[in-house]
Every structure is written in C-alpha cells, then in structure tokens.
C-alpha cells in the first residue's frame, strides 16, 4: 500500500488534534462528579463507562494522522493500566497537557531534545517526591477508603475490604457475573500463578485479551511438551468428553502451539495451552499446587513417551479458569479436600524447618492460596449495560486497592501532584547541568521542567471543573494551603484530603506520570508522520 508523509509543524498539529480529541473524551470522567461516556461497539451492545483505558481503546478517528496521535496517547493509558491497574484517566490528562505545552514551545523554535530531557528529568524528581509523601495503609478502614474512592461507591469499598480480610492483602480476588441484580462476595478454592496463553489466537475476549474456560479439564505437565503426538490421545478424549481443556506446562514446542491454536480457531476443540512463567522452585511449586488443588498430578512426560497411561479421567477439574496476559487464576478446583489438607500440613512442616527468607515467603504464599482460596465478587445489575459498567468499576477499584497496599497512598484529587510540583521551583536546578552543557541548552531543559510543573495542575483542575466550579480561583488558593489540603468535589470545600479519606494510591500516580512523560517526550520529538494512502476505487464504466 502507498504511503503519505507529512512533516514538521503540519505533522505535529494534526497529531495534536487526534490527541486532544481522545483526551477530551476521557477527561470528562475524572473525579466523583465525572460523567460517563457511551461507546458504540460493532459486534456488541453499547457500553456506558467512565474507565479511561476502555474509552481510549474504542476510539478510532477517520483522519489517519489524527488517529496516529490518538493511538499514541492511548499507550499512556494502556501501559498505566497494565502496570498499576488504574490511573488511566490521570495518565491521559497529563500526557495531553505535556504534549500541548511541549509542541507549543517546539513550534517556536526550541530544541526538542533539550525539552525532552527536561520533561524526563523533572518527572523523575516528582516521582521521588511522591515517594516521600507516601503513607502506608494497614487497617481495613483505610483499605475501604481507597476502594470507595476508586469505585465511587462506599458499598463497593466495603465489599473489597471484606474480600481482602477473607483472603489476605496479597490474596486472589476476582470478579464474575451474578445471575441476580445483587452484588455479593463469596470465597472458593482456587490458586493463581504467573502464566499466560501460549498464543494470542487462543484468546476468547479480544477486548480484555483474556480467556475464560468454564468447567475445564486440566492437564499439568512438569516438562516441556515437544510434540502434538504426546498429547493426541488426550485431545481426542477431550473432544469426546465435551469439556474445555487447559494444558499447563513450563513450555511448548512451536508445532504444538500452532496445532492447538488452529484446531481451536476451527472449533474442533476448545483448548488453551498455558505457559507457566514461574522459574526454578517457584515453577515446581506452582505446578504441584495446581495439580493437587484441581485433583490431578504434575505429570513428568519423558520425550517421545507421551502421556501413555493418562486418560481424560485422570485430569484435574475446576469450576472456572481465567487466563490473562500475565497470570492465570483457577477458581473452584475440585481436588480431594483431605489430600489438600495433608499437603498444607506438609508445607507447614517445611515452614517450621526452613531458615531461608525466600523459601519461607514462598511456602507462606502457597499455604495462603491452598487454605484461604479465592474471593469472588459476583457482580449484579438490572441490565447487561449496568452490570458491565459496575464490573469495570469494581475491577479498577480492586487494582487501585492492591496498588495502595503495595506502595501506600498520597493525597487524592490531584493534590499529591500539586504538592510534589514544588520541588521543580528549586533555584539550584541549574547547577545539575552547568558542567555538561551550554547556557542556551540549560534554558531549554528548564523549559521542560516548567512544562511538567504546569502540567501537574491539570488533574486537579479537571476534577474541580467536572464538579461545576471554576478551577482558576480554587487552584490559586490551594497553592497557598499547607501540604495535603485540597478541594473536595463532593462538598465543594477545601479539606485535608487524607484525613477525609480522599486519597490516591502512590503507585498509580507514579505510573501515570511516568507513562505520560514517556508518551509526551516521544511526541514532541516527532518530525514526520507516515500513514497509508487508501486506494481509490475506479468506478468508471469500461466497455
């Protein structure tokens, strides 16, 4: 296909138009007074959501250069979501603000490389400052506050806090569709391990890039599966049995993955190969625990011998398996309870004998999974639309809460970023660069610092604006307040944010800033946009 090229200011202007279109759609959702976006979907019902990454993924612009800009800024949202599980709207707002300010300066003749360096260095300083402000959370009340803020619901906050109390702060909590309008919490047997599908062609949910298997049979292999011949009898048996088949192994030969993927796409068999991405003792432990919890063995298949004595009846069972990009969760494993109990007793015995911290932590983790199980939040709703919207909010809140437990919290409502921005006004900043570059370069690097400093106001400004209040006056007043004081969008008053339960997970805010700065830095150093030229159809009549 032919390509078209567009250069310099023209390229940046059109990229920026796409960036602003997607960011303006996303940022109306931020804060407790944020609004929803309704998305048309080609092969599904419309979706009402306030989830930034979901909105960003769905938008496709008609102008090819604008669409490139839209897709690039959505990277900030997607990568933030992949790491922190939330903060996608904050990342989008920051990326938009930095990119607009950066391109404005570049178009006036500044050196993009110096501006980029300033943005990157300033962002690192802010991240360190956020870590200083961070406060660890320990109590159920604090966990409930984080979940309630993220989801916009005190009821959801309570539910997530209860779930963490049941399975532990590092336990497995997942969501599922309820068959009623009520949202409830239950615990069941289950484990989670690092492992994902061996081929993207095995994915059943393209939107989330995950696979869900209901009532699957489970084959666990302790060695790499090298040929399809090894597992052919089991594949044939599974077709007759009618249940989906989950195959978990340390690795698979390319031939095996291709054959399984092709047969899944053809509808011959519902099979998913999962590569266990744990290593060493952790891999051995994950496979052993999976086998015991699902009622099977971790088979040691020697090359060319296959699984001669293994039939479908020897395989494990579970109520449900969720396979995501980085982890696999097995829910409702149907292993023998007495065997699981003996296995836990054996692990407790090992725990008493070990003096190595790594081994001790691993054994504790295994015991927790096998004895505490998995918490399942069953999401209800009056309609399918309402159920999906609520499920997205709960999943975001779960991710936020886990991030808060991991790295602590800062003042919410964009106040943490506002407070941290003070570090960029330090008069000694110039000294960082005096021995390595010219005065002109230093000026431009500090312009990058200024871009970041001004951009850090954007999340708070948008939250205030979404609440129906003029943000200019409020932001001016907040700059003169003590650290941690911000604007409560619910009461429209200035309050101590953390004391009033208005918080953000430190990890989420740090990740949003890091990814936004990365995207903005890449965009402001872009000078050429290349896109496909659509071929025109010749509709003229020929004799």
UniProtKB/Swiss-Prot annotation:
ATP binds at residues 29-32, 86-90, 413, 504. GO terms for biological process: chaperone cofactor-dependent protein refolding; protein refolding; response to heat. Disruption phenotype: Probably essential, it was not disrupted in a global transposon mutagenesis study. Keywords: ATP-binding, Chaperone, Cytoplasm, Isomerase, Nucleotide-binding. It comes from the Bacteria. Its main location: cytoplasm. InterPro entries: Chaperonin_Cpn60_CS, Cpn60/GroEL, Cpn60/GroEL/TCP-1, GroEL-like_apical_dom_sf, GROEL-like_equatorial_sf, TCP-1-like_intermed_sf. GO terms for molecular function: ATP binding; ATP-dependent protein folding chaperone; isomerase activity; unfolded protein binding. GO terms for cellular component: GroEL-GroES complex. Together with its co-chaperonin GroES, plays an essential role in assisting protein folding. The GroEL-GroES system forms a nano-cage that allows encapsulation of the non-native substrate proteins and provides a physical environment optimized to promote and accelerate protein folding. This is Chaperonin GroEL.
């Amino acid at each position: 296909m032919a390509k078209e090229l567009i250069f310099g200011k023209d390229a940046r202007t059109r990229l920026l138009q796409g960036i602003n279109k997607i960011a303006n759609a996303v940022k109306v959702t931020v804060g407790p007074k944020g609004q929803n976006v309704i998305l048309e979907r080609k092969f599904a019902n419309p979706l009402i959501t306030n989830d930034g990454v979901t909105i960003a993924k769905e938008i496709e612009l008609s102008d090819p250069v604008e669409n490139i800009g839209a897709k690039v800024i959505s990277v900030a949202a997607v990568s933030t979501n992949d790491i922190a599980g939330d903060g996608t709207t904050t990342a989008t707002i920051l990326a938009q603000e930095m990119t607009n300010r950066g391109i404005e300066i570049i178009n006036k003749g500044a050196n993009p490389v110096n501006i980029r360096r300033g943005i990157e260095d300033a962002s690192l300083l802010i991240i360190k400052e956020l870590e200083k402000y961070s406060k660890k959370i320990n109590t159920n009340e604090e966990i409930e506050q984080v979940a309630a803020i993220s989801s916009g619901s005190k009821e959801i906050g309570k539910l997530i806090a209860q779930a963490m109390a049941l399975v532990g702060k590092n336990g497995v909590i997942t969501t599922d569709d309820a068959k009623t309008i009520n949202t409830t919490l239950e615990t069941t047997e289950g484990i989670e391990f690092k492992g994902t599908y061996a081929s993207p062609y095995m994915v059943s949910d393209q939107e989330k890039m995950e696979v869900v298997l209901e009532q699957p049979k489970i084959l666990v292999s302790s060695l790499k599966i090298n040929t399809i011949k090894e597992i052919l009898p089991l594949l044939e048996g599974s077709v007759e049995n009618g249940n989906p088949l989950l195959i978990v192994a340390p690795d698979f030969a390319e031939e095996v993955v291709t054959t399984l993927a092709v047969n899944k796409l053809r509808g011959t068999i519902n099979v998913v190969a999962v590569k266990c991405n744990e290593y060493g003792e952790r891999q051995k432990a994950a496979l052993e625990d999976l086998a015991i919890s699902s009622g099977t063995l971790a088979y040691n298949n020697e090359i060319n011998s296959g699984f001669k004595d293994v039939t479908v009846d020897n395989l494990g069972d579970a109520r449900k398996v969720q396979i995501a990009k980085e982890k696999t969760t097995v829910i409702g494993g149907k292993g023998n309870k007495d065997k699981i109990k003996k296995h836990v007793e054996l692990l407790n015995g090992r725990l008493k004998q070990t003096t190595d911290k790594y081994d001790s932590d691993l054994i504790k983790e295994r015991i927790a999974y096998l004895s505490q199980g998995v918490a399942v939040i069953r999401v209800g709703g009056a309609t399918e639309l309402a159920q999906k919207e609520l499920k997205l909010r709960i999943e975001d809140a779960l991710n936020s809460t886990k991030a808060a437990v991991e790295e602590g919290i800062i003042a919410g409502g964009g106040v943490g970023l506002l407070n941290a921005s003070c570090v960029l006004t330090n008069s000694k900043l110039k000294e960082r660069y005096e021995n390595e570059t010219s005065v002109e370069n230093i000026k431009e690097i500090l312009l990058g610092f200024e871009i970041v400093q001004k951009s850090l106001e954007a999340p708070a400004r948008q939250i205030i604006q979404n609440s129906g209040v003029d943000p200019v006056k409020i932001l001016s007043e907040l700059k003169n307040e003590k650290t941690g004081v911000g604007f409560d969008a619910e009461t429209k008053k200035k309050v101590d944010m953390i004391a009033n339960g208005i918080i953000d997970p430190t990890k989420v805010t740090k990740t949003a800033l890091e990814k936004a700065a990365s995207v903005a830095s890449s965009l402001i150093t872009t000078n050429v946009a290349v896109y496909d030229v659509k071929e025109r159809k010749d509709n003229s009549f020929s004799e």
